[in-house]
């Protein structure tokens, strides 16, 4: 199974890349973590937020492989504990499909794109900056894998 994070935004601080790479390297090949950065629509284009989200949605669609299971990150999504995320990861793995986590830009994700997803996931009730979302998601996916495989990383 491959875990793909399709995230709008291309110029992240160095600490984000360092943290992302660290968690991605920790995961084994049968649960590989891959980042697909999506070019954001310029906020100076004169387009409405809905038009910008639609343009970003088209770029996200293009970046995803066919047949991937889509999970949108959204503030109104399911709030899972880490253990519940681990159980969900196990179900996704048993289903035999790659999983893509979609992270929107400053205005969020296009409504039609969210509707095409098989689930909505909320990382926190707090508003998080986009660089932090990448790191937090990578860490939680690694932690979920650690729980699933009885790796000692997670101590609860």
UniProtKB/Swiss-Prot annotation:
Keywords, in A-Z order: Cytoplasm, Methyltransferase, rRNA processing, S-adenosyl-L-methionine, Transferase
Alphabetized SUPFAM superfamilies for the sequence: alpha/beta knot (SSF75217)
Coiled-coil parts of chain: none
Assigned GO CC terms: cytoplasm
Compartment(s) of residence: Cytoplasm
Binding, S-adenosyl-L-methionine: 73, 104, 123-128
InterPro entries documented for this protein: Alpha/beta_knot_MTases (IPR029028), RlmH-like (IPR003742), tRNA_m1G_MTases_N (IPR029026)
Reaction(s) catalysed by this chain's protein: pseudouridine(1915) in 23S rRNA + S-adenosyl-L-methionine = N(3)-methylpseudouridine(1915) in 23S rRNA + S-adenosyl-L-homocysteine + H(+)
Free-text function comment from the UniProt entry: Specifically methylates the pseudouridine at position 1915 (m3Psi1915) in 23S rRNA.
Record's protein name: Ribosomal RNA large subunit methyltransferase H
Organism: Bordetella pertussis (strain Tohama I / ATCC BAA-589 / NCTC 13251)
Gene expressing this chain: rlmH
